[in-house]
């Protein structure tokens, strides 16, 4: 059975834990209890393939930023989450992505952009169009979700697994070409 290491990142209070617990335990946690780091595992079937999701729910607070490099190194795919009710959480997403790319030392990594708390449309500070434009700039899928209403919860995680699969297939088919490119000649 294939195992996928997913990391969920974003600012504090955007609903990372709520999304993860809704996926794993099928219930919504209403109270906000800042996460330092939690790990969850769930066996699922995605596109007729049984696989194991190893999900790392991370701290959004800045005081835990030193821990980020470590979990970014081990993650295969990243759910970048902001709250549609928080302009600042949206503005932070680019720096999370930049840190992921720097740590992974790649130009592109499997990533999904998620605008959470879609059930709070009356408190919206970030438009759907802004989310779509940011995702287009990142060259990644985008969706809005609601952990509370269970909207696009599974879809977000499953789409990320599909992105990882695409990346793995791309690495296999172009692996030989990439190895040939990395040559050094000293005269």
Curated annotation (Swiss-Prot):
Chain span(s) of sequence motif Effector region: 32-40
Catalytic activity of the protein: GTP + H2O = GDP + phosphate + H(+)
CDD domains: H_N_K_Ras_like (cd04138)
EC number: 3.6.5.2
GO CC terms of this entry: cytosol; lipid droplet; macropinocytic cup; plasma membrane
Keyword field: Cell membrane, GTP-binding, Hydrolase, Lipoprotein, Membrane, Methylation, Nucleotide-binding, Prenylation
Summary of activators and inhibitors of this protein: Alternates between an inactive form bound to GDP and an active form bound to GTP. Activated by a guanine nucleotide-exchange factor (GEF) and inactivated by a GTPase-activating protein (GAP).
Residue span(s) of the pro-peptide: 185-187
Compartments it resides in: Cell membrane
Signal sequence residues: none
Chief location: membrane
Membrane topology: Lipid-anchor
Any matching Pfam family: Ras
Modified residues (Cysteine methyl ester): 184
Molecular-function annotations in GO: filamin binding; G protein activity; GDP binding; GTP binding; GTPase activity; mitogen-activated protein kinase binding; protein kinase B binding; protein kinase inhibitor activity
Homology family: Belongs to the small GTPase superfamily. Ras family.
Function in brief: Ras proteins bind GDP/GTP and possess intrinsic GTPase activity.
Name the record gives this protein: Ras-like protein rasD
Annotated source species: Dictyostelium discoideum (Social amoeba)
């Amino acid at each position: 059975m294939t195992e996928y290491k997913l990391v969920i990142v974003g600012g504090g209070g955007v609903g990372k834990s709520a999304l993860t617990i809704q996926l794993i335990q099928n219930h919504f946690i209403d109270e906000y209890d800042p996460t330092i780091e939690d790990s969850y595992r769930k066996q699922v079937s995605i596109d007729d393939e049984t696989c194991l999701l190893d999900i790392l729910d991370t701290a959004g607070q800045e005081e835990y930023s030193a821990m980020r490099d470590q979990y970014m190194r081990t993650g295969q795919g990243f759910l970048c989450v902001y709250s549609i009710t928080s302009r600042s959480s949206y503005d932070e997403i680019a720096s999370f992505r930049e840190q992921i790319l720097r740590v992974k030392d790649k130009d592109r990594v499997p990533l999904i952009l998620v605008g959470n708390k879609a059930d709070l449309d009356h408190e919206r500070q970030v438009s759907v169009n802004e989310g779509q434009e940011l995702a287009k700039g990142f060259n990644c899928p985008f969706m809005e979700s609601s952990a509370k209403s269970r909207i696009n919860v599974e879809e977000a995680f499953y789409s990320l697994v599909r992105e990882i699969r695409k990346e793995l297939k791309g690495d296999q088919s172009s692996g030989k070409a990439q190895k040939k490119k990395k040559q050094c000649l000293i005269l």
